[in-house]
């Protein structure tokens, strides 16, 4: 297995619930190293830029509204097969379909307010990490 990096967001609803520490504990318990992290409040322009690939879809405006509704945590996780393992830990996008014990089963409120985001491919991970972090902000451990 290769060591990979993946990008992760703890979304506004999970930040508001004060479960950042619980989610970070789950990341570390699953064998991920958190190699970069910061809290920020997205502007509309930042959210639209990040979700550019979804522009024109029916859920786009609601997604942007939600992602700008409060602070988020963005982080880079590192570990073996990190992209797929992080997606498995998150659970299904729709929390109604998420397996028990996944982050979305435990912390999501709805399809849109689904608590967390994670990269779905190496290309997405590279783009998403670069959107929020410079190489100097990532500290391999």
UniProtKB/Swiss-Prot annotation:
One example of a Gene Ontology biological process annotation: GTP biosynthetic process
Positions annotated to bind ATP: 11, 59, 87, 93, 104, 114
Domain of life: Bacteria
Cofactors demanded by this protein: Mg(2+)
DNA damage recorded as keyword: no
UniProt keyword list: ATP-binding, Cytoplasm, Kinase, Magnesium, Metal-binding, Nucleotide metabolism, Nucleotide-binding, Phosphoprotein, Transferase
Localization per Swiss-Prot or TrEMBL: Cytoplasm
Enzyme Commission identifier(s): 2.7.4.6
InterPro entries named among the record's database cross-references: NDK-like_dom (IPR034907), NDK-like_dom_sf (IPR036850), Nucleoside_diP_kinase (IPR001564), Nucleoside_diP_kinase_AS (IPR023005)
Pfam families documented for this protein: NDK (PF00334)
Active site: 117
GO-annotated cellular components: cytoplasm
Major location category of this protein: cytoplasm
Molecular function per GO: ATP binding; metal ion binding; nucleoside diphosphate kinase activity
Catalytic activity entry: a 2'-deoxyribonucleoside 5'-diphosphate + ATP = a 2'-deoxyribonucleoside 5'-triphosphate + ADP; a ribonucleoside 5'-diphosphate + ATP = a ribonucleoside 5'-triphosphate + ADP
PANTHER family: NUCLEOSIDE DIPHOSPHATE KINASE (PTHR46161), NUCLEOSIDE DIPHOSPHATE KINASE DDB_G0292928-RELATED (PTHR46161:SF3)
Entry's family note: Belongs to the NDK family.
Subunit structure: Homotetramer.
Protein name, as recorded: Nucleoside diphosphate kinase
Organism: Proteus mirabilis (strain HI4320)
Gene name tied to this protein: ndk
């Amino acid at each position: 297995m290769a060591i990979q990096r993946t990008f992760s967001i703890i979304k506004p609803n999970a930040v508001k619930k004060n479960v950042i520490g619980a989610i970070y504990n789950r990341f570390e318990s699953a064998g991920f190293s958190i190699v970069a992290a910061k809290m920020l409040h997205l502007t509309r322009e930042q959210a639209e830029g990040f979700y550019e690939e979804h522009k024109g879809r029916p859920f786009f405006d609601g997604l942007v509204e939600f992602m700008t509704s409060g602070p988020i945590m963005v982080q880079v996780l590192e570990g073996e097969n990190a992209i797929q393992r992080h997606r498995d830990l998150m659970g299904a996008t729709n929390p109604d379909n998420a397996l028990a014990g996944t982050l979305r089963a435990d912390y999501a409120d709805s399809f849109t307010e689904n608590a967390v985001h994670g990269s779905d491919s190496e290309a997405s991970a590279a783009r998403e990490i670069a959107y929020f972090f410079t190489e100097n902000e990532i500290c391999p451990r």
